[in-house]
Amino acid sequence: PDLDDDYCPTRPGAPCAFLVPAWLGEQETKAQMHLYQLGLLALSLNRTLVLPNVAKSRLSCCYHNPFSFYYAADALDQLGVRTISQAEFVEWSEKRDPAPSAQVVSMVGAKATYLAGAIEIDSASDPTLVPNKPTRNLCLKAPKTRLDFSGHSPLAIYPPEGYHRSEAGRLGFGESVVNTLSSPEVGGKSSRASASRDAPYELPNVLAFNYELRFPIMAPSVVSLVLPSVPPPLPFAHFPYSPVWTDLASNVAASLSPFIAIHWRTETLAPPNLAPCASSLLRKLSLLKSRYPSIKNVYLATDYPIEDPSGIAHSGTFAKVVTEQHHQAFRAFLKSFEKEAKGLSLTTFAREQGRVVLPDALREALATASAEAGKPVGLGELDAGLMGIVDKAVAMRAEVFLTGFAGVGKEAALGCAKVSSFTSQIIEARQARIGEQSAKEDQVRGELWNDVSRWSVKGPDDD
């Protein structure tokens, strides 16, 4: 292609101006929601979203696996968000002449000193640094890309105190963010292109985001309000996973069917609840076995490293808070399962991956990784985040799904889990599949028998 200012890798009709999610807070399940938020923001600013790379249940420009390693490559496009891959974006930055201009934008939680919200323009520091977080590497500086940050000072945008307590407050803040990033006044003050304040301001080609908000600030209605010419995007839906992971999950589910899948999130669960919850879970399994006699297998997905208690927890954040009570509770659970769960066999993905037929692409990837490491490499060693993805995909396909009761407020003492977006994604997928089943006249093997069942400290009958 002609490598002048008109060279652009976007799809027809998509603008050659970009929003890059350089760093996203939170792990994979919630990071999907945050990426969708930035996709809506990109649309509102008439920009194209760059799909971040992925690894270890995180989404960031700093990782080596492409977005399509976890998800369907067109996951955001299916929702009406215009995207390109990070590889396409980097290639564009290398070929474009002149070098693309860029600006760092940081969005974090409310700040006590800015009760009404605020915009900070850091006109003195290195323009490639994240305001107030100088050690955070966005992985967009040379030689990673040819982006030129020198012409624009970093921006930090803070929401008003309590903005998240109402939908109006959240979306109102979202509209103000769109106005801020479109504002000639803000843009002029953040420009370093000339010492003269009268110099014309040009929007940067690229906005590089450090995004740490926990609550949604954008909705399709905001996009339609600020840019009515753009077709309205669809509401958020969890991204479909790459076919290699859904094929693998289908193979595992077929080998276990009919089976119960359990998601037991113990992170932040009160340690005194662990032992009684484990006992209650065993009673619940016995009840389900009597209700569904054909079930012989139980698939356990948990953040506790049940295969190797001395190993790494399945959740990166949980690894910091695992206690001796966790170890005691799970040792007791495993020992009691063998005695009390008559007719049931307990398994995990770590045990199943050696028993099922692996998709060709995965088998080749594991063979390559094993050759490079000089020893056999499993899925968790290939990428620790894949364990959670496959656990979710398997649980979505189980005939029966079981999770702990999330005790809140006065019922906290009964809790055997905490509210989890991981669990919510499984339940939503199961409800959608059950809805599809109800439209069929004939029942077939592999259909779901419930959307979710729960157990609590007080007993197994709490659905």
Regions found by a protein language model. Name each.
Residues 386-447:
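A donor-sugar binding/catalytic signature common to diverse glycosyltransferases
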Residues 57-71, 426, 449-461:
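Short, mixed-charge aromatic SLiMs
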Residues 23-26, 380-381, 410-414:
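Active-site rim elements
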Residues 1-297, 301-304:
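Secretory-pathway glycan-assembly enzymes, especially type II membrane glycosyltransferases
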Residues 121, 128-133, 138-143, 155, ...:
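Surface-exposed intrinsically disordered loops and tails
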Residues 276-387, 429, 433-439:
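Catalytic lobes of large eukaryotic enzymes
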Residues 60-65, 271-275, 308-319, 406, ...:
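A short acidic (Asp/Glu
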